[in-house]
Amino acid sequence: MVYQGNRITVTMLEDGIANMQYNAENESVNKFDTETNKQFAEVVNALEKADDIKGLIVTSSKGVFIAGADITEFVASFKQSEEEIKDWVININDAFNRFEDLPFPKVAAINGAALGGGCEMTLVCEYRVMSDKAIIGLPETQLGIFPGFGGTVRSTRVIGIDNALELIATGTPKKALDALKLGLVDATVAADDLQDAAIDLVKKCISDELDWQAKREEKLVPVKLNQLEQAMAFNSAKGMIFAKANPKQYPAPALAIAAIEKHVNLPRDKAIEVEAAGFAKAAKTPQAESLVGLFLSDQLVKKLAKQHSKKAHDINEAAVLGAGIMGGGIAYQAASKGLPIIMKDIKSEQLDLGMGEASKLLGKMVDRGKITPAKMGETLSRIRPTLNYGDFAETDIVIEAVVENPNVKRAVLKEVEGLVKDDCILASNTSTISITFLAEALERPENFVGMHFFNPVNRMPLVEVIRGEKSSEEAISTTVALATKMGKVPVVVNDCPGFLVNRVLFPYFGAFDLLLKQGADFAHVDKVMEKFGWPMGPAYLIDVVGLDTGVHGAEVMAEGFPDRMKPDYKGAIEHLYENKRLGQKNGVGFYKYEMDKRGKPKKVADEATYELLKTTTDSDKQTFEDQAIIDRTMLAFCNETVRCLEDNIVSTPSEADMAMIMGVGFPPFRGGPCRYIDQMGLDNYLALCEKYAYLGKAYEAPQKIRDMAAAGETFYATA
């Protein structure tokens, strides 16, 4: 035994070949946490002193090779100064550099995901052999940072500037064959043959069949491209990367490119220093704080979903009531994850529409090469369309997805309750109707919950699981388990008008309506909010949702929260709806819609909208600075999020933030409404509320904000 630790061991195999194995005790995956970094440095010390080692393989005892750095440690680490972060990273890099410089060949045997620091560990080896089931990549830019353990330095020298920039800037991991084509790995083999293949490579190095020292040397020197070739590579990459990610919103790719431009002409050790300085700069951006926080929130939400699922019944078959686009989307989602599902409607044309939706979605996957035609047929066979309830006796859970009308929903739920087994869970896919109210029609209200999918079902990850007054833990558990089984991220919320997401969204629409009443141009508001980071502004969003849906939802919300969601004027949204402008669904809303070459609706300006809005705009029109537009819309949005926490509609800031990002597209780089308030500072946010309180209750600071500001608290821990 060369080294024995609880994170890494080094043992001798045969013929002078050592096996350095990552094996984090009591952990599901290997990662570069503080203890692993410490032990890695100790391993390097031991290897430098060993005189009987001729070669070495790097392996993992886990299903994952190495998942990367321990992101939970980033929060504290990134609170350090930029200079301290740089020194911290350089210190870690010292062990990587010394490992690379060891006087014998090293081969990484990549059995599973090698991400971030895991990929960087493989790059300090001369050769990399990969299981055909593994993935490899440098996803750090998705956290607002970029590789800091030599990843930008070695990748540019191993796979070239253009390939390295694409790998780093997109953050997308590569499958084995793609990694092989890129030159990121040297061979791919079946998982069972991996260790033997790695040992064989080491033996070829030892016998001088392979020039491993030349492979190492190319990572120690500047990139072998002349200035013109470098300029072409960087300019091409910048054009592609900046077209996909606005550097003002997501600065990490731009900072990575800047660091690489500086270090491509430097030897390794100097280049590592440049990388470390750039990494430290990225780590201190608010976007890194938000995106690291978002990752941790995502982990928490998934952990809470597991906890909520503990009392779940087995789900062997589901059913959806109501076909059409929504029902078909739900059926597709279940079937694509291996769950048989019955799709029931009273009209055969709706069943055709639902099956057509599922077929269309699967057909697109076939076209992209994601699945085979045979797999498509197998998936479709899991969906059973029917006009009657004959097969419902053994169904474990029924999702009601009929028209958004409380009387229709109550009647349908009452009917199906009498036809299913006693422990069958009933779930209503409603966006605004009270679950407690719908439950009044049922004999077994404890078996009833809300299950709010977002449209389009196949693309929107969030599902709100709504607890009514009488919903049992078993019902909640089973519904959460179903959502997870369907590949969705469930967030459990308590019952109220609009639940969580729509309750927060409608004050945002209300703030937008008030801006228009006072003279703002809806197209300009859209541009401002898109620049702020939203995928679409409020006018475009309500067009996509449907103005009819918006008006109906606003009526429900006004009844539930008349103090802040019942305006004393007719707004632009309602007026356009009354003039039969429904948005994309009938081609005219705030914008006019024309089909592009791909058959997708494209928005264009429509003078008729401005004519109609003259009747809902004040005669003494105001002009608004862009920041005022942002402040007014975001105050209404964030205040209602905080009120949902106050009212225990949602349990944690993490769940609230993730729901707003996944459900309505809150800018991820801002971390969610709670983190947005934290980054603004509670005192500054409170002052902004007081500045705009004259506009109405929606703009007044919730008591929770006042209490937190007085106590010097934040939504997220600062240490």
UniProtKB/Swiss-Prot annotation:
InterPro entries: 3-OHacyl-CoA_DH_CS, 3-OHacyl-CoA_DH_NAD-bd, 3HC_DH_C, 6-PGluconate_DH-like_C_sf, ClpP/crotonase-like_dom_sf, Enoyl-CoA_hydra/iso, FA_oxidation_alpha_subunit, FadB. Residues 313-719 are annotated as: 3-hydroxyacyl-CoA dehydrogenase. GO terms for molecular function: 3-hydroxybutyryl-CoA epimerase activity; delta(3)-delta(2)-enoyl-CoA isomerase activity; enoyl-CoA hydratase activity; long-chain-3-hydroxyacyl-CoA dehydrogenase activity; NAD+ binding. One of its GO terms (cellular component) is fatty acid beta-oxidation multienzyme complex. It comes from the Bacteria. The active site is at 452 (for 3-hydroxyacyl-coa dehydrogenase activity). Pfam families: 3HCDH, 3HCDH_N, ECH_1. NAD(+) binds at residues 326, 345, 402-404, 409, 431, 455. Residues 1-190 are annotated as: Enoyl-CoA hydratase/isomerase. Keywords: Fatty acid metabolism, Isomerase, Lipid degradation, Lipid metabolism, Lyase, Multifunctional enzyme, NAD, Oxidoreductase. Pathway: Lipid metabolism; fatty acid beta-oxidation. One of its GO terms (biological process) is fatty acid beta-oxidation. Gene3D superfamilies: 1.10.1040.50, 2-enoyl-CoA Hydratase, Chain A, domain 1, NAD(P)-binding Rossmann-like Domain. In the N-terminal section; belongs to the enoyl-CoA hydratase/isomerase family. In the C-terminal section; belongs to the 3-hydroxyacyl-CoA dehydrogenase family. NCBIfam families: FadB, PRK11730.1. Heterotetramer of two alpha chains (FadB) and two beta chains (FadA). This is Fatty acid oxidation complex subunit alpha.
